[in-house]
């Protein structure tokens, strides 16, 4: 396993995930009968700071359809948690309009690179262009100064 599992931390994430799903109206328990489901949910709500109990609750009561999605969410969160420890693996998100993202993705595919690599290449291209324009402007100014002196 690439990322170490931290039981207490992940138990808290699972508790938050389940509570959030419950508040969004999803069925988080395996029970069809609403009173049994509500008893199980009430139990869960009381065990926020008891990681072992949360894990036992999950084993006993979780909706099987939700279990895999929760595992995927926790796996992604674990990855983000460990990646955030190092500057070179830390990720940030940006909002792009769909058409901008589409053009960027197409360019990345043509260049056979990731979106991040493509953005870095575009920035470097723009910086080189700016530097070239500054050099040309400076040369033009120097040339005018030389010709003006004569």
Swiss-Prot record:
One of its GO terms (molecular function) is sequence-specific DNA binding. GO terms for cellular component: cytoplasm. GO terms for biological process: cell division; regulation of DNA-templated transcription. Keywords: Cell cycle, Cell division, Cytoplasm, DNA-binding. InterPro entries: Arc_rbn_hlx_hlx, MatP, MatP_C, MatP_N, MatP_N_sf. It is found in: Cytoplasm. The keyword Ribosomal protein does not apply. Its main location: cytoplasm. Gene3D superfamilies: MatP, N-terminal domain (1.20.1270.380), Met repressor-like (1.10.1220.10). Belongs to the MatP family. Required for spatial organization of the terminus region of the chromosome (Ter macrodomain) during the cell cycle. Prevents early segregation of duplicated Ter macrodomains during cell division. Binds specifically to matS, which is a 13 bp signature motif repeated within the Ter macrodomain. Homodimer. This is Macrodomain Ter protein. It comes from Erwinia tasmaniensis (strain DSM 17950 / CFBP 7177 / CIP 109463 / NCPPB 4357 / Et1/99). The gene is matP.
